[in-house]
Amino acid sequence: GPLQLSWNYNYGAAGK
């Protein structure tokens, strides 16, 4: 869902 995509997006944006 959108929640999973959200955490994924933030994860990539953080560069982790």
UniProtKB/Swiss-Prot annotation:
Cited InterPro entries: Lysozyme-like_dom_sf (IPR023346)
Keyword annotations of the record: Carbohydrate metabolism, Chitin degradation, Glycosidase, Hydrolase, Plant defense, Polysaccharide degradation
Catalytic activity reported: Random endo-hydrolysis of N-acetyl-beta-D-glucosaminide (1->4)-beta-linkages in chitin and chitodextrins
GO BP annotation list: chitin catabolic process; defense response; polysaccharide catabolic process
GO molecular function terms noted in the UniProt entry: endochitinase activity
Secretion signal span: none
Source species, domain of life: Eukaryota
EC numbers for this chain: 3.2.1.14
Function (record text): Defense against chitin-containing fungal pathogens.
Entry similarity comment: Belongs to the glycosyl hydrolase 19 family. Chitinase class I subfamily.
Protein name in the entry: Endochitinase 1
Origin organism lineage: Eukaryota, Viridiplantae, Streptophyta, Embryophyta, Tracheophyta
